[in-house]
Amino acid sequence: MTKTALLKLFVAIVITFILILPEYFKTPKERTLELSCLEVCLQSNFTYSLSSLNFSFVTFLQPVRETQIIMRIFLNPSNFRNFTRTCQDITGEFKMCSSCLVCESKGNMDFISQEQTSKVLIRRGSMEVKANDFHSPCQHFNFSVAPLVDHLEEYNTTCHLKNHTGRSTIMEDEPSKEKSINYTCRIMEYPNDCIHISLHLEMDIKNITCSMKITWYILVLLVFIFLIILTIRKILEGQRRVQKWQSHRDKPTSVLLRGSDSEKLRALNVQVLSAETTQRLPLDQVQEVLPPIPEL
């Protein structure tokens, strides 16, 4: 391959690398995921623990609708094994969902990444509630969870369940609570011993720079260093060519002629010298040298 073809290939590789590179540096911005918990069914004889509740919850990153995520929180760890059968019956009778909370997101569902929308993430956390303040199912929760995602991607996820206890039979009759819907827990009591709660969940997701992105940073640095070295080399080669051409131009002719050429140079010098001497002779001497012309 010629130098021109190699240069074109190198330029094409660099352009492709620059175009693909931003895809590897896309990091999910710190955002807030709003989950509106639609309803929770609690039996009248359900009792909470005194000091704290250890719970596990499963998030299905599977679009039920375009902008919806179903999130199921199990306050009772014993129900965790039967979460599929339990939450499948939530649209029907509420026999098996005494501690099942169903939430859906208001915003975009790709709050972690689009590639993980079909995976099931199991998250575990802890929730501490004082016994004397636990007068209703709605409390102020602050807990941290760690999703099980790909090993190349690491996330710190902090969930804040911000709500306020409120009881009403008709939610639309309270305009003051409509303004503070982000921090309001709406409770509606029904005759079938079920309580429907509407919550607001704020989830801040922060991305940590992983080894993959560090590798790409190093590759970018190496490419730039290579380009700088190549440019400096081309500049130095051009300067060397100019200096070499000037040195060849300034060399005397006698240095370039060798062997038989030196003899020709000496003969040439002798002829030039004799011509110069004859030109410098006076006119009388020139006449003496010339022979007389015979008369006809």
From Swiss-Prot:
Q: Its GO CC terms?
A: membrane
Please give the chief subcellular localization of this protein: membrane
In its keyword annotation, does this UniProt entry include Cytoplasm? no
Domain of life of the source: Eukaryota
Glycosylation sites per record:
45, 156
Q: Quote the protein name from its UniProt record.
A: Transmembrane protein 156
Cell compartments where the protein resides = Membrane
Q: State the InterPro entries in the record.
A: TMEM156 (IPR029374)
